Amino acid sequence: MKFKEIFKGNNSAYGIMQLTGETTEKGKAVAKAFIKRETITDKLWQEHIDGKEPALGVIPINEDNQCRWGCIDIDVYNVDHLVLMRSIKGLGFPLVTFRSKSGGAHLFLFSKEDIPASLM
């Protein structure tokens, strides 16, 4: 599974998040998050890709304090994702933009090889 390679991270734990259906005054979707001290299975990956809850949260830093990707979480819930993507492209930043479940944005940076987490 290609997603599994792209989002390679910690093999001994992962996060899960379940939306409650509520929102804050600022418009953020409310969720409950937990850490599971287990290996991520192919079934969990597939369910995440299929959009089933709970959402899967890969921990990017592996057991050797290295990572292949990082993510900036933007907690602005009325952000215009198209404007954000154009701004990032205009600045020449190598970031990939996704809408987060809460309505904000996640900006991902990827590396072809493991690098020290402190550099990411």
Predicted regions and their residues:
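DNA replication initiation on ssDNA origins
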Residues: 1-69, 78-86
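Active-site-proximal helix/loop segments of hydrolytic enzymes
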Residues: 72
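Anionic group-transfer/hydrolysis microenvironments
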Residues: 75
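Broad hydrophobic/π-residue packing in well-ordered secondary structure
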Residues: 13, 105-109
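A short linear hydrophobic-aromatic micro-motif
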Residues: 92-98
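Short, conserved phosphate-binding/catalytic loop or strand-edge motifs used
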Residues: 98-106
